[in-house]
């Protein structure tokens, strides 16, 4: 768990939640000035500066970790995710699922990269930490934000999409079934509508 601070009581609660499953909780407290160059651009009422820790995992987490699975706190896991965990990350920075807003031209125009790279949702990310360290993903995120702050709207998600534009692998929708697909539906004209339908029913 990466956080600016957690009380002993909070740590105990989290350890007690993990203990029955034979899991250990590790806590990482980054330096207070680590996020000083960033600012919240959107959803400020429900997102804190801590969202930018996601850009900095390669410098926060120990080098003994080669990869890490990041999950937003509202993710519900309904089955075995070992298949996703075992995704081949050779030569890429992360495995991810396309975002529900991937077809919005505005995103690519604003961020200045080609639409053919698509746009992923950062709520579920299988991160290749070795790749991030080698390619200094954290430094790239900082530099982009400092250089083009006006381009950023969806906070760290925008930054990671730019930096990992050509260095990611997409996985099936079932690994990150975003709530918008249930609220707005999926265009039934798409060729793989039947596959999408199955993933909606069995995420």
Name each model-derived stretch.
Residues 5-12, 104:
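Short, charged/polar "capping" segments at the starts of alpha-helices
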Residues 37-49, 108-113, 185-190:
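Short, surface-exposed amphipathic charged segments that create phosphate/polyanion-binding patches used
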Residues 95-102, 117-203:
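Catalytic core and acceptor-binding pocket of nucleotide-sugar-dependent glycosyltransferases
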Residues 1-5, 96-97:
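Short internal beta-strands
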Residues 17-18, 85-89, 143:
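Glycine-rich, phosphate-binding/catalytic loops in enzymes
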Residues 29-35, 50-104, 126-127, 133-135:
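GT-A fold catalytic core of metal-dependent nucleotide-sugar glycosyltransferases
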Residues 9-10, 15-60:
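Active-site-proximal specificity loops/subdomain of glycosyltransferases
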Residues 9-13, 81, 181-183:
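A short acidic (Asp/Glu
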């Amino acid at each position: 768990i990466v956080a600016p601070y957690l009380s002993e009581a909070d740590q105990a609660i989290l350890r007690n939640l993990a203990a029955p499953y034979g899991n250990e909780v590790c806590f990482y407290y980054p330096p207070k000035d680590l996020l000083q160059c960033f600012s919240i651009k959107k959803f400020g009422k429900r997102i804190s500066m801590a969202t930018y820790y996601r850009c900095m995992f390669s410098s926060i987490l120990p080098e003994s970790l080669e990869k890490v699975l990041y999950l937003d706190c509202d993710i519900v896991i309904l089955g075995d995710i070992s298949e996703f965990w075992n995704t081949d990350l050779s030569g890429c920075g992360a495995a991810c699922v396309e975002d529900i807003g991937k077809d919005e031209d505005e995103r690519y125009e604003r961020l200045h990269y080609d639409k053919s790279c698509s746009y992923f949702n950062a709520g579920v990310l299988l991160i290749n930490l070795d790749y991030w360290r080698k390619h200094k993903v954290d430094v790239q995120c900082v530099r982009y934000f400092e250089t083009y702050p006006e381009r950023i709207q969806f906070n760290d998600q925008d930054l990671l999409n730019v930096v990992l534009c050509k260095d990611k692998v997409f996985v099936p929708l079932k690994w990150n079934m975003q709530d918008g697909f249930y609220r707005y539906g999926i265009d039934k004209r798409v060729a793989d509508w039947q596959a999408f339908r199955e993933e909606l029913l069995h995420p």
